[in-house]
Amino acid sequence: MLKSLRYGKEFEELYTGNYSRLYYYAYQFLNDAEVSRDVVNDAFEYVWKNYENFRKMNVVAILFLSVRNKSIDTFRHNKVEE
């Protein structure tokens, strides 16, 4: 339980310290506030589910890469629908 509490605190700091930057990064690709929030939240969910594996890596870089890839995928998907 202490381990999960520690991870929760680390993740909370990661979230509060990086959410805004990731949101604006996604928004540059998507120009849609709601979709940008969804993309960023998906990236954080991915990291949370795999946090044990990522702890020794540059998690912020993983988040930016995840947001970038998801933003590009979403942009392409939206273009096809138009």
Please report, for each region that a protein language model flagged, where it lies by residue:
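A short, charge-rich alpha-helical start-of-domain segment used by transcription regulators
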Residues: 1-24, 28
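Sigma70-family region 2
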Residues: 4, 41-58, 77-78
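Amphipathic alpha-helical recognition patches that constitute DNA-binding helices
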Residues: 10, 21, 25, 35, ...
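Amphipathic alpha-helical interaction elements
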Residues: 27-31, 52-55
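Arg/Lys-rich amphipathic alpha helix in sigma70-family domain 2
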Residues: 65-82
